[in-house]
């Protein structure tokens, strides 16, 4: 027989505080019965010697000391099945696409099991996104966690959808799936995501979770865990390679801050809770490859930097946990370049283990290094030209300046539905590097020049 407790002593924002009468588990699900006969769901957020704090999913409007609380003894579980593929769900796992509820193979705790560090395998397989600035210079590797640092008004949603449509492990016939979770988005954005997935056919191999801006903040904290649980199930139970795309982590962190303020916690940097680093790590660290298991979980987390400030706590802490970052540039966006990814501050720390002969191509590393060096020099020269003018530059410097423009216009720029193979990306790279004198290609070995340089191929 279930017991109902009427010991509510305080209601604060999305939280209720109860006097503790018997042991309660952390994260335990709760049913709240209102005096008018309606019910709400909640979860135990904190428990002490004499008090229990419950976060209410549907908001606390209408709750008072007459409301009854029933503890279920269970944590939040996601019903999982391979039938999730092709479905659009709410942030709480409820169908949004008009389809039936998913008949589960099992119900899995959304907090997941921690991954034993010894059982992790080093990521080393290339994932092709079809976007040259990622594949060519900041390569994504299977099992990696790589965030995209963007800003308000920049096309990070379009980049996320393009990756969701195009991502694949080239040359592999192993099943590949995408789990897409959007947090705190508007109804307009949700419709845009749903339409794009359905029109392009990407939905067939995807599971989509959408948490709207007017949904409870508590649900925003649950959404990425739902997505990662679905990804782990597909990867570790069905041997699929799963790419998880989470957008927008900033909205998730704002929900954390809101919950912390409601609990009257002592705030950390800029009002965010002091445990935000640990909390973000509990999401990011669920990516990886495990010994003896064919499947893998790779993670793209998109976050908008408030005020384009890369030192803001959210991108700052994310950078410590993740394995690099892709930086979306407002300057390139103003020039009308899509995708406006600035490769210079971008970095993929695992790139070297996922490229080269047998993975991408033997010249990949050398070409990437040479383009970085030449583009960085060309960008520096733009600042010099603004002061002394083009006429003061040497012939060599003019070539570098032209290379920077070519790099942005031909390598960075591509259309929203252009899916470039790694061979396409490297071919374009060689075509623009060929505009520089060979003597300036100091980072490329002669054997690669002989094999791939367009001038050498013509002479043959």
From Swiss-Prot:
It is found in: Cell membrane. It comes from the Archaea. One of its GO terms (biological process) is proton motive force-driven plasma membrane ATP synthesis. InterPro entries: ATP-synt_VA_C, ATPase_a/bsu_AS, ATPase_A1-cplx_bsu, ATPase_F1/V1/A1_a/bsu_N, ATPase_F1/V1/A1_a/bsu_nucl-bd, P-loop_NTPase, V-ATPase_su_B/beta. The keyword Iron does not apply. Keywords: ATP synthesis, Cell membrane, Hydrogen ion transport, Ion transport, Membrane, Transport. CDD domains: ATP-synt_V_A-type_beta_C, ATP-synt_V_A-type_beta_N, V_A-ATPase_B. GO terms for cellular component: plasma membrane; proton-transporting two-sector ATPase complex, catalytic domain. It is a peripheral membrane protein. Pfam families: ATP-synt_ab, ATP-synt_ab_N, ATP-synt_VA_C. Its main location: membrane. GO terms for molecular function: ATP binding; proton-transporting ATP synthase activity, rotational mechanism. PANTHER family: V-TYPE PROTON ATPASE SUBUNIT B. Has multiple subunits with at least A(3), B(3), C, D, E, F, H, I and proteolipid K(x). Component of the A-type ATP synthase that produces ATP from ADP in the presence of a proton gradient across the membrane. The B chain is a regulatory subunit. Belongs to the ATPase alpha/beta chains family. This is A-type ATP synthase subunit B. It comes from Methanococcoides burtonii (strain DSM 6242 / NBRC 107633 / OCM 468 / ACE-M). The gene is atpB.
């Amino acid at each position: 027989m279930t017991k109902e407790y009427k010991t509510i002593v305080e209601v604060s924002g999305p939280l209720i505080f109860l006097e503790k009468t018997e042991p309660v588990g952390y994260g335990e699900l709760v049913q709240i019965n209102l005096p008018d006969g309606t019910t709400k769901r909640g979860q135990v957020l904190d428990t002490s010697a004499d008090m229990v704090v419950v976060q209410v999913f549907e908001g606390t409007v209408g709750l008072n000391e007459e409301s009854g609380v029933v503890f279920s003894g269970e944590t939040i579980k996601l019903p999982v099945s391979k039938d999730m593929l092709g479905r659009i769900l709410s942030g709480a796992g409820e169908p949004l696409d008009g389809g039936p509820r998913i008949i589960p193979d099992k119900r899995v705790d959304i907090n997941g099991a921690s991954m034993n560090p010894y059982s992790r395998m080093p990521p080393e397989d290339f994932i092709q996104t079809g976007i040259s600035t990622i594949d060519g210079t900041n390569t994504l590797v299977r099992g990696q966690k790589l965030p995209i640092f963007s800003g308000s008004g920049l096309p990070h949603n379009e980049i996320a959808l393009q990756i969701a449509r195009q991502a694949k492990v080239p040359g592999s016939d192993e099943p590949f799936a995408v789990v897409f979770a959007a947090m705190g988005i508007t109804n307009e954005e949700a419709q845009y995501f749903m339409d794009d997935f359905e029109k392009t056919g990407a939905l067939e191999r995807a599971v989509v979770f959408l948490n709207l801006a007017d949904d409870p903040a508590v649900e925003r904290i649950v959404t990425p865990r739902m997505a990662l649980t679905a990804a782990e199930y597909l990867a570790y139970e069905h041997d699929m390679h799963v790419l998880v795309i989470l957008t927008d982590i900033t909205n998730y962190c704002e929900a954390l801050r809101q919950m912390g303020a409601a609990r009257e916690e002592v705030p950390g940097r800029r009002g965010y809770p002091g445990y935000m680093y640990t909390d973000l790590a509990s999401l990011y660290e669920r990516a990886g490859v495990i010994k003896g298991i064919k499947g893998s979980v790779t993670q793209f987390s998109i976050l908008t930097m408030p005020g384009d400030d890369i030192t803001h706590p959210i991108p700052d802490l994310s950078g410590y946990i993740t394995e690099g970052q892709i930086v979306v540039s407002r300057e390139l966006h103003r020039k009308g370049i899509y995708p406006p990814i600035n490769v210079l501050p971008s970095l993929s720390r695992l790139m070297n283990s996922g490229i080269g002969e047998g993975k991408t191509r033997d010249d990949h590393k050398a070409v990437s290094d040479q383009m970085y060096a030449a583009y960085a020099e060309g960008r520096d020269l733009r600042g010099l030209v603004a002061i002394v003018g083009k006429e003061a530059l040497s012939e060599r410097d003019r070539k570098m300046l032209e290379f920077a423009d070519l790099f942005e216009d031909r390598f960075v720029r591509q259309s929203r539905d252009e899916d470039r193979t790694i061979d396409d990306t490297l071919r374009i790279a060689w075509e623009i590097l060929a505009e520089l004198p060979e003597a300036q290609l100091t980072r490329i070995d002669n054997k690669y020049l002989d094999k791939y340089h367009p001038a050498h191929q013509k002479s043959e």
